[in-house]
C-alpha cells in the first residue's frame, strides 16, 4: 500500500525512478542519462557535452551501461524518457562502473589518442587539460597504434585564439559556441572521419566579441590564448576572485598573477550575471595594465611634468586649494572608479565646502533624486530570460555589454519573444524589428503598439540619454513604459543599461551635485573652477585655465591635461566595491600591487586630506567601509541586488522637454577602445584595427 502511494506521488510530480550504481533516485524525465547519473553522485567523463551548448554526442566518452540494452549508450544524448520500460515495471538500472563501461571508455580513449600528438610539455593547456585528466583516469598505459599520426595545418582565426589543430579531437564545442551563444557562425567542420577539420572556411579573423571563450571550452590544446602563449603554467599562478570593469555588467572573473604581474583573466560562473562567459576585452586587456603606467607623482613646472615626492605634490595641491573657495573647487569621477574612493572624494569635497561633484556624462538626466529604480536595470540581467518582448532604445548591447547581448540571443533562441530596436541599425547577432532611428519613433510606437505582452522590457542605452534632449527621451520612455505595461505588479522591465562600471555606484552614493552644485557640463566650462580633481577621468575635454589634479593609472588624456598627477591603482591592484548596472554590489579583491610609488586611490585621498587641513576620519579601508555602509546600508549586501521602488519611474515622466530628430546612436563607437587601460593595450589596438577593416570590407 505504501509503495503504491509512493509511486503515485512520483507520477504526480512527473518524476522517474532510476537506479544508478545501486543507488535509487528520482529524476525529471527530461534529464539526460548523464544528468541522472550525476544527480546520483556518479562521475561521468565527457569531452563534447557542455551544459550551455546543444548536444552533439561526438566523443562517446560518456558511455554507460543500461541494463537490458546490449551495447553501451552515450549518456549525454539519451534521455531518461527515452529508456525502454522494463516488462515488470521496475526502475531502469544504469551502471557507470561495470566492466563493460570500463572497457568501452578505454577503447574510446585509445581512439582519441591515436592521432593526438605528444605535445604536453609544450602545450599551453598542460596542467588544466581535460584530455590529460581523463586519459589518466579512464585510459590505459600503452597504446597499440604504431602507424603514422595525421597532421593538420594550423589556421589563422585572429590575434586572440591560437590554433594547433593537430591536437583537435573534433568535439565541436567551438563550432556550437560561435553558432549558438555568440551568434556569429564563423567556425565549421569540413571533411569526414580522419579528414575532418575545424576551420573558418575562408581563412580570416573571427569577429565575435566573445570568441575567446572557445579557449575555455576547448577540452584539449587545439585552441589556446595567443597573447598568453608560453607565458606561465597554471600551478605557478595565484588565483584571485574579482569583478570585471570593462563594462557595467560586472562579470565574475578570476585574476591569475605571478609575483606582481597579472598574467591572465578568466571567467567565473555567476548564473545571475555572466553565466560563465566574458568578453574578449575583459580577458585580453591584461597587457594594458603593464604599459603607459603612472608610477610616481608629477607636478607641472614651466609647462613640463616633473617627477616629485608625494609630499611636494600634496603641498602644491594644498597651496592651490587654500587660495580658492569651496564654490570654485570641483571633482569628477571616471568610469573605472570604485565606490570606496568616490565616497572618500565626496567626503573630502564636503569638508572643503564644495557641492561640485559628478560622475555622469555631460548633460545626463540620471540623478539620485529620482530614486534607484530610475537608473538601474530593474528586471535584473537574469530577467531577460523571462521577457516576452524586448525594446532596445539607443543601445547596441553587442558593443556596450557583449555578455548581456549573448543573454538576449539566448532568449531569442528559446523562442516566443519580440525584439525591437529604436536607434542605429547594427548586427546584434539575432533578428529584430527595426522601428526607426529617432526618439519620435518611440512616440509613434506607443500609439500603434501591438497587444500588450505579459513581461515586456525596455533596455535604454546611454546613447539615448547622453545628448541634449536626454531628459526628454527618458521621460518619453517612462511614459511609454507606463502605457505598455513595462512596469506593473510583479514585473519591472524598465532597464537602464550603463556602459561605465563606476556610474551605478556613483549614483548609489550620491556622487552627483546637490542643490546649488555644478554638474559635469558646468564644471567643464572655462573659468568656472580654480581647482578640479579628476578621479580617473579620461573621456572629457578639460578646458585650459584651471588647476587640474589627476588621480589615475595611465598616461592618458586626463594625465596630459593635469598640473599634478597622483598615481593610483588599477582595478586588479585594489580591494574595492563596484555596483553593476542592475544594482548588484560586488567586491573586487586585490590580486596584484600597483607599480612603483602608486597607491590605492582612497589612501591617496586620506593622505591628501591632512595637508589640506581637512583630515578624513578613516585610517584604514575597513574604517572607510564602515562609514560607507552606515551611510548606504544596501552596499554591504555583497552579491545581492537591492531593488529600487518601481514608483520612482513615474517621476521620470515629469521631466518633460522637447526631443529633437537626431538619430539615437550607441555610446560606444569602438568596442575595443573604451577606457585608459584598453587604449594602452597593443592587443586591443590590433583587434580594433581588424574590426574597422572588416567593417570597411562589409560596406564595400
Q: How does the language model describe each region?
A:
Residues 361-641, 696-700:
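Non-catalytic alpha/beta scaffold blocks inside enzyme catalytic domains
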Residues 623-700:
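Long, low-complexity segments enriched in small/aliphatic residues
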Residues 2-30, 35-38, 50, 65-69, ...:
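N-terminal export/assembly segments and adjacent metallocofactor-ligating motifs
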Residues 47-55:
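Serine/threonine-rich, repeat-prone extracellular segments and beta-strand-based repeat modules
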Residues 36, 44-45:
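Protein-protein interaction/assembly regions in multi-subunit complexes
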Residues 59-80:
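N-terminal single-stranded DNA-binding subdomain of primase/primase-helicase replication proteins
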Residues 55-60, 249-251:
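Short, basic and Ser/Thr-rich N-terminal targeting/leader segments
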